[in-house]
Regions:
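Ordered alpha/beta subdomains of enzyme catalytic regions
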Residues: 1-160
């Protein structure tokens, strides 16, 4: 438990199936489709062409849809106090499997381009039942298509 010594466990402990995880073996097809769609839009240089009324006068016409950067948060919706586990393994999945395959079929790891914040395994978080008041256990900011494929396995780990 890393809450005691603040040291993260590594993949030497977990032995994640990196090769298959990078290929979407453990992911819902939906997330694979999203990754393909965003990669295709990026290759085509597609930019936002619609209207975004809630952004007012902000010009979004140069927004590259395929390269959108997002903040994704993992949090509990189980009421009361929850002991968090699985964070270190999720971080290893993100570290070894965030990225894409280039035109030559070589995996390009993009972990170093992500901004990641996470609590330590063993930490406690609470949820009051109010969906506007959550405590994220992990936050990742970066290009969504680089880690979309990991949504299913990371959620699965944290919800066991």
């Amino acid at each position: 438990m890393t809450i005691f010594n603040r040291e993260r466990l590594t993949n030497d402990v977990f032995k994640i199936d990196i090769k298959r995880m990078r290929r979407g073996w453990y992911s819902d097809k939906y997330f694979e489709n999203i990754g393909v769609m965003l990669s295709t839009l990026a290759q085509q240089g597609y930019v936002f062409k619609g209207e975004a009324l809630r952004f007012g006068d902000v010009d979004l016409s140069k927004t590259e849809v395929g390269n959108l950067e997002v903040e994704m948060q993992w949090f509990t919706r189980r009421s009361g106090k929850v002991v968090v586990a699985g964070v270190d393994k999720v971080l290893m999945m993100l570290k070894h499997c965030s990225g894409y395959f280039n035109g030559n079929g070589k995996f390009v790891n993009t972990w170093n381009r992500l901004e990641v914040e996470a609590v330590h395994d063993g930490a406690t978080v609470t949820y009051s039942g109010d969906p506007t008041s959550i405590q994220p256990v992990i936050r990742v900011r970066g290009r969504y298509r680089d880690f979309a494929l990991l949504e299913t396995p990371t959620l699965g780990l944290l919800t066991r």
